[in-house]
Amino acid sequence: MEIVLRGTHLVDIAPLWKRGDLYQVSIMRSEMVELLRDCDNKEVMVIVAGVPFRGRLKYETPKRGHPYIRIFLPKKLNVIWAKLHETAGKVKVEIIIENEGTRGDSYGKQ
């Protein structure tokens, strides 16, 4: 049975990591990872610590450990991510999976 997530709003607290000059959040809670597994490599609306942007979800399966969802954060906001990384370590992450047709997919179709 496939779970349809269109129009879904998910919230979690996730660690904020730095990898090279990029920042990322990793959704590691198994329930959330399973829900988002079918959204691998899809662009969704993401709000990290109150900062909204369009991001791509990446389903990762490491050789050791448990699968997780990785979201790279916009590089142009590195100043914000650096401050959050040093002060908080974990941030509130909201993932909004939009309904079909909200981005103009069905515009003008009768």
Model-found features: residue ranges?
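Long, compositionally biased stretches
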Residues: 1-65, 85-110
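Acidic, low-complexity intrinsically disordered segments
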Residues: 69-79
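Exposed beta-sheet edge/beta-hairpin loop segments within beta-rich domains
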Residues: 79-85
